[in-house]
């Protein structure tokens, strides 16, 4: 990085998607200010996603939109996409330990970016999203640090895998094995 800090990117390419994660050398707690990992989709890509504060005990209605119209929307992973060429895609994270769970944000030009919110809340956008009348929401965490530490005395902070899965149909997407392949084995 320009500031002299070092970090590493691990990436895996699969026949049906990609996964990447960051490793940050550290011998103790570090402040995390945000993330720039993003995917850009073709105009006209269809997206289905949940958006809202799930911690309040009610089920959030899934949204049915185009990536052309999701700027400033919060997309709870996994978000599912249908590209104009008929390819299905899903974005999520895998192997989450000692790190803040991510959400996705709709950005300009059909870009979907990983980011963080306090308690995975809702970014208010004036779009009806199925929120209850009380409209619980939280502001997006922007340039407000949160603290993470290396896992179990290790000498680096490891982010969850950022996973993009691809398939010809929904069955292929559901049966995608990337998450299992990049995650730690169960105890």
Feature roles, as predicted:
Residues 1-186:
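N-terminal accessory beta-strand-rich subdomains and adjacent acidic, glycine-rich linkers
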